[in-house]
Structures are given as structure tokens and as C-alpha cells.
């Protein structure tokens, strides 16, 4: 910025001088730092009249998410039906279509968050991610349930009608499961208590939200937000739920057809048989399961899937690095052995697709550090 002082017009202030170029640059940096909310004001918004069909939604997801075809089909249809129902208020129809919130079950790094974020990107709706583990019942240390809507409002730049058509992804929903099959006698402020608190948000109600987040206070001005048209997508790893599924299937496989039914069950992929009663056995209360009627699962990623994720998606980490080096006039190439090494480490660490980025970042750190000093115009890893 100091180089801009030479030959530039100066803005004079009591405490000193600042050149016109610096003032402009400082303003641009400040505006960028204020967040994406203001940028969204001029961005394309959701057009219900031109809502993408399920096949178009899935095609868009295919560009960013490798595999998980079953989950993508479920999401595409459910999201389409959710936003299509918003047209009902203009139709004068007496039949009220209820919204279908979604719950996705899958291990870490299988693409749950990416799927939700990509759908929001396609539809141009406000999107926020909430970690269920930080939520507590009202009156206890932690974040209130209403903080979910505060985050959504912030993303929408406090445009309430826009926020009321947004998408909320609640991650780690399995971490607020109650500890036993029976209702808790003692206060479970971060488990069953949070599930109870989420009910009114999921089913659709008007919630008074503190404008700047934090706890509610008497005489504080509130922002009413109707959650009726907000799509809630919940995700969790549900570690150990395969045992619940197996127990349920074993109790059903009795009688003279037992051997035949047992042969059909794929013990290597028990997740495909997941049902709402398994979520109940895991510790979700029946009321919250009923408000998450669309249940889908994501398969663990094998070596082939991880290899494809590394290079094929539109925003893959490898393509990102190639673009970054290209901006410095350097052509970056990778040998196949490097890809195999990255996949080996990702399998070893058991972090799924999420682990790919950290491994690539570690490998590329030295190259990026010396990009402007030592690297030739063609660089191979």
C-alpha cells in the first residue's frame, strides 16, 4: 500500500495523510471482510417458477460429489418437493403439503455436508451449518436452539423472507442422542433436552430470535422467523448403528424361511437396511424422527471413490492447486504415484474425503512457500 503514495492524490486528515489509492483499497478490503451476506443481496435468488427438476438437481450434484447415487436421488426428489410446495400458497388448493426434512447417516468424510452445501448453491438460498454438540437447553451454558436461526439470518443479511426459504444443515445430530432407550429421569441439557428444543423448529413455527445472537433478555427486541418453509437437513455418523440394524434384522429372521432371508442380507453393508426404528434404538426420540421423514444413508468411500474425488469433481483439491499455480504462470502436474500415496494415507487415517485435502496441503506446502522464488514454469509433483 505504501507504494501508492508516489504520484497519487492525497486525502488529508487531522492525524496524517492517506493516498486516494490506499483509501479505495482499504474500502474494498473492508467491504469484503464484512461478509458474504451483502454480496448475496445482488446475487441470483431462488426462483420458484424455474425450480430445477430432480434430474437436474442430481446432475448438478454429480459435478461436485462422487458416488453416493442413492443419497443424491433421495435429496434431489425431497428438495424439489420441499420447494415446490411453496407454490401451493398461490394455487388456492385445500390440500396442505407438509415439508419433508431430511436426515443423512454416514461416516465422517462421506459427503454429507458437501451435498447440502451444493444444493443450496444450486438454488441460491441462504445456507448455514450448525454443530449440534454446542447446543444446549435454554438457560444452560452453551448455544440456545434459536442461535441456529440467528446464523441463518446473518447469512441472509437479516432479510427475513429470504432466510425463511433457506437451508439449515445440523451436523453431528447423533451426538445429541439420549444415553439410554428409556426417557431420561435426570436433566440431559445437551442430549434429549436439545432434541425436544429442536422440535418446534423442525415442524414449523414462529420463533422469536435475538437480533445479534446470544441469550434472550427481557424487553429485548426480537425478530420473528417462521420456520415452516426452512429446509432442515441433519447429518451424523451414528457410529455403531450397524449393530442396531443387525439386531433388528436378526429378530425378524425367524421361522422356516430364516436361512433364505439370512442369505439375502449383505453383512458388509448393513447401512443399506437402515430404518427409522434403528434411529430410535440409537437414542433419537420418536418425535424428532417423525419430523425427519426422509432417511437416507451414505456409503463408506473405497479406494476407487477416493481416487476419483481427488481429481474428478469440478472443485477437486488437485484442480484447485493447478489453478493456483497457473495464476503464477506455472504449469503444475502430478504423477500417478502421488495420487496413490495420497489415497493410501487417506485410507490409513480413516478420514474419508475430508482427509484428502489435509494430506494434499501437507505435500504442497513447500512448493507453495517457494513458488515465487525457485519453481520453474513447469513443476511436477
Predicted regions and their residues:
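Short conserved motifs of the RecA-like P-loop NTPase core
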Residues: 56-60, 333-345
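Single conserved hydrophobic/aromatic residue that forms the stacking wall/gate
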Residues: 1-7, 12, 372-381
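Dynamic helix-loop-helix/coil hinge segments at AAA+ ATPase domain boundaries and subdomain interfaces
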Residues: 46-73
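Glycine- and Gly-Pro-enriched alpha-helical subdomains that act as flexible
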Residues: 308-315
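Conserved C-terminal helix/linker of AAA+ ATPases
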Residues: 89-90, 360-361, 365-373, 380
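Conserved ASCE/P-loop NTPase catalytic core
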Residues: 9, 58-59, 79-295, 299-302, ...
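N-terminal accessory segments that target, anchor, or regulate ATP-driven/P-loop NTPase machines
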Residues: 8-9, 13-39
Amino acid at each position: 500500500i505504501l507504494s501508492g503514495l508516489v504520484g497519487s492524490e492525497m486525502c488529508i486528515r487531522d492525524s496524517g495523510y492517506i493516498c486516494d489509492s490506499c483509501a479505495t483499497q482499504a474500502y474494498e478490503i473492508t467491504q469484503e471482510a464484512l461478509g458474504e451476506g451483502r454480496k448475496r443481496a445482488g446475487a441470483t435468488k431462488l426462483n420458484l417458477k424455474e425450480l430445477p427438476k430432480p434430474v437436474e438437481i442430481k446432475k448438478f450434484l454429480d459435478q461436485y460429489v462422487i458416488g453416493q447415487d442413492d443419497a443424491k436421488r433421495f435429496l434431489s426428489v425431497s428438495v424439489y418437493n420441499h420447494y415446490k410446495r411453496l407454490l401451493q400458497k398461490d394455487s388456492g388448493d385445500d390440500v396442505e403439503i407438509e415439508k419433508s426434512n431430511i436426515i443423512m447417516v454416514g461416516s465422517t468424510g462421506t459427503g454429507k455436508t458437501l451435498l447440502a452445501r451444493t444444493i443450496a448453491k444450486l438454488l441460491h438460498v441462504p445456507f448455514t451449518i450448525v454443530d449440534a454438540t454446542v447446543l444446549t437447553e435454554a438457560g444452560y451454558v452453551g448455544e440456545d436452539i434459536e442461535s441456529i436461526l440467528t446464523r441463518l439470518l446473518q447469512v441472509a443479511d437479516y432479510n427475513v423472507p429470504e432466510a425463511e426459504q433457506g437451508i439449515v444443515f445440523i451436523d453431528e445430530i447423533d451426538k445429541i442422542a439420549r444415553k439410554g432407550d428409556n426417557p431420561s429421569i435426570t436433566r440431559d441439557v445437551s442430549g434429549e433436552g436439545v432434541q425436544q428444543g429442536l422440535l418446534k423448529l423442525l415442524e414449523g413455527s414462529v420463533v422469536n430470535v435475538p437480533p445479534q445472537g446470544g441469550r434472550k433478555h427481557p424487553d429485548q427486541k426480537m425478530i420473528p422467523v417462521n420456520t415452516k418453509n426452512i429446509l432442515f437437513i441433519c447429518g451424523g455418523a451414528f457410529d455403531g448403528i450397524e449393530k442396531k440394524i443387525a439386531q433388528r434384522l436378526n429378530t425378524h429372521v425367524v421361522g422356516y424361511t430364516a436361512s433364505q432371508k439370512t442369505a439375502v442380507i449383505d453383512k458388509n453393508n448393513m447401512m443399506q437396511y437402515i430404518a427409522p426404528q434403528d434411529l430410535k434404538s440409537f437414542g433419537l426420540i420418536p418425535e424428532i424422527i417423525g419430523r425427519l421423514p426422509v432417511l437416507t444413508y451414505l456409503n463408506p468411500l473405497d479406494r476407487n471413490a477416493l481416487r476419483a474425488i481427488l481429481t474428478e469433481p469440478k472443485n477437486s483439491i488437485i484442480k484447485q492447486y493447478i489453478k493456483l499455480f497457473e495464476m503464477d504462470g506455472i504449469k503444475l502436474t502430478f504423477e500417478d504415484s502421488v495420487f496413490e500415496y495420497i489415497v493410501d494415507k487417506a485410507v490409513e487415517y480413516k478420514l474419508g474425503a475430508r482427509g484428502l485435502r489435509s494430506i494434499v496441503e501437507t505435500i504442497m506446502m513447500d512448493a507453495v512457500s517457494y513458488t515465487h522464488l525457485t519453481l520453474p514454469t513447469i513443476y511436477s509433483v
